[in-house]
């Protein structure tokens, strides 16, 4: 299949308006939409076609509350690395949507999946984590195309999350994903607008 300019324009718009969302409306997400997101995530590339990502959908308010407590502790610990005005700025940043998002997913990487038969990862096992990252990004774009927002929470103690969710011992926690209708949309990252870190172009070096 060959694509045309309308396809390129649509993809660029989805990419431009994809944000790491922290502010969500409580509107529930239709199960048919969630099924579409799951199907698109499975279209992501992976090393050896191993599809090492594993996903737990967390609906329990009690589990979410424990993850939020985990976040609050990890955030406080991370905040000790900052001082002065930077510490004050850090305290104002909203770094999670656990308290609002209607759909929440814990994503893991299987450390040694049988699928793929080890192809492509013997010399670079990190490709399993890279595959999971690509699956998350694929889901992110699919969510945005559904007029949803996705926020990835990384300020967490991963081992505590693994214990809390009773994850198998060969699953490594990667990210907590919050998904829902965003309170607002923006074509500029929140951290750029907040003055924490502006968007900068990446130069491609040549050899």
Swiss-Prot record:
Catalysis performed (reactions): FMNH2 + O2 = dialurate + 5,6-dimethylbenzimidazole + D-erythrose 4-phosphate + H(+)
Family named by the database record: Belongs to the BluB family.
Binding site for FMN: 18-22, 46, 95, 154
GO MF annotation, one: nucleotide binding
Database matches in InterPro entries: BluB, Nitroreductase, Nitroreductase-like, Nitroreductase/BluB
Record bears the keyword Transcription regulation: no
Protein name according to UniProt: 5,6-dimethylbenzimidazole synthase
Keywords: Cobalamin biosynthesis, Flavoprotein, FMN, NAD, NADP, Nucleotide-binding, Oxidoreductase
UniProt-listed GO biological process terms: cobalamin biosynthetic process
Function: Involved in the biosynthesis of cobalamin (vitamin B12). Catalyzes the oxidative fragmentation and contraction of the isoalloxazine heterocycle and the cleavage of the ribityl tail of FMNH(2) to form 5,6-dimethylbenzimidazole (DMB) and D-erythrose 4-phosphate (E4P). NAD(P)H is only required initially to reduce FMN and oxygen drives the oxidative fragmentation.
Subunit structure: Homooctamer.
Matching Pfam families: Nitroreductase
Enzyme Commission no: 1.13.11.79
Classification via NCBIfam families: BluB
